[in-house]
């Protein structure tokens, strides 16, 4: 492959060569654009829109539109797009991923495709990873768009629905991936069309696309409501988990033992597979659980909840670690983001894992939540007509972007050559020796005034290192808490000479680290990685914090044989070999085998994580098809379409299904079980029971026809009871919405239960995914049949007394990815009306006797 690349150039080089003529065209237009007055430049927007209406395509407009934005940026921001930024802008317009190194001005690049695509008037979403960046970019880059006459909006966590709707109506909207996803889910829970906030998903430009579409894609977005379940089972399972004994992982059985047929006895009550983060009970463990709960068989369907909860308790004790995965603060368990190391208030693990950790830590166990709506980022972003992304690191995950999102990655060359030195990893035997070496390196760099950024993986590691530096008297700043506006300032100051900053993973990503002159002459920013991350991409992101725009700098990773990566994925034989060499304390080990082993371990984990995400997507695909059907049906109701034909079809379907269920095709009418037919049909459609004399000598189809005619007449009689025809049409919509929402929410829960129990199918030599699909489709069919029955039953039994109003089926209590910013308090616009005041709507009655009645 490498030889072919040398002969023909890499994929990226070939693609860039192909778009260079466009770049030349944009460059040629520069003098013309500079000659225009501000008003003439602004007038270009109107001109382009008119040309689009006359049939010109966006691709034909691209050179002029990009030249316009380039000139506007020069006038407004005093920043002019470099050639490489123009290349990036073209790649983004084509719906691809532009890999641009840190400091190459990705934010400015996005203005080009955002402007061009906004000309169509269908809206453009610029998606960022947090509220701070969304607000900063909207205020900063928004100036260019506003200068050119476009409206720019920004959606923040604190906005109300009305404010969100207004921001989404703008030509270009800056928003975080979580807010956008949750707004989509909330839009599919509203009960009036006027409550919708989003417009159609037309074009998205995703900043830090690897973070959004890959790192965060392992957890779906979930909107939850309160569940009625008790929390006692979590506490009981926690008590039992503490008494259970951990056994040896069967994976440690060598290949030779397997070939020789050596039988390894199961040990302990449960086995933990740290690589895949799975806990399994042994036979002894199953017996212990059955004895503890006084049950006969743990595998019985009615014991599924106990089985699920004991596994959760064991996971909480053996795979979830305090100060690494979560922290305990103010009697609450708060999650730590594994990618940024930030605390995330308001976010909770789903499936009851959060409750299991609360029981483990002896804090108040909160009621489990019920999922009201959910979607994965993969399925959500694939709804956009066109999407593009930019990041500093995407090539290592190109296969995933191609397979799942249909996007290829084009590496954009840097504006100036990279001057950063990436040094060989330093490997030590123990963690203690490694930390000693890191402190030494920081002390040496600090002595000559070179700024240092130390990247850690966990909060615990950053605090440990901070203590060691404090003992050495090195002044430093630590960044590991939740994102706050100070963070960007601390990160920006990390390039000042003599600065020492310790930060978890990607804290402050999106903020440039600029060097002062003294720091530049001291060798630029020195990056120290205290551990290799599971993903090479995140290591590359840390390296990329240094050496922006041709600045000097260096990066080096320090590793010990005790690190999780080496312990879990390094080969036992290699670690044993280094231990046997008797290397003296604090001696750095340099060996080609080690560097290769680290690279191999990371590739193993990356493909493992890709597998997890692909698996999640395959399972979610089943739900996605069902979600599309339900959401489309809801939208028809919201759009105010007449549901009369839908209801008539439901009535005839119920008659068909009931007759088919009770009456055999070839049975004579004298053999029909009328008692059963009436007992099934009459509770739903209140007809006169069918009598024997009505049907003598009848065929099955004639029976169906007779019942359908009676049922339709019954419904027409119900319609006649309503003085206004629109009243029954609205009643149909109210009942349909209520039934669909109730059944869909229960269905999400049922599918969740099915998913948790489906793994057991593997023991029966069945493919769990195939079984899940089959069972899922059966459950969906059953749900749609239930929707039909409940809707028809409610409509035919309803009494006309008062005007019906729509109401939401469940109250939303939270989401699993809440941003930490609180909602702004709602201010009352008009004066408060008290019960004894006259009604403000002019009825002449007191308010409490008129509109104030509940």
Outline where the language-model segments fall.
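Membrane-interface amphipathic helices and adjacent TM-edge segments
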Residues: 468-470, 835-838
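Processing junctions and N-termini across compartments
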Residues: 833-835, 844-845
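Short, Lys/Glu-rich amphipathic helical modules
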Residues: 448-462, 639-640, 692-696, 840
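Cysteine-centered loop/knuckle micro-motif
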Residues: 841, 848-852
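Conserved P-loop NTPase motor core
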Residues: 1-582, 631-632, 649, 653
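ATP-binding Walker
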Residues: 104, 845-846
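Extended, charged helical/alpha-beta scaffold domains that provide interaction surfaces
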Residues: 326-334, 340-348, 549-550, 557, ...
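Short alpha-helical segment immediately N-terminal to, or the first helix within
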Residues: 91, 839-840
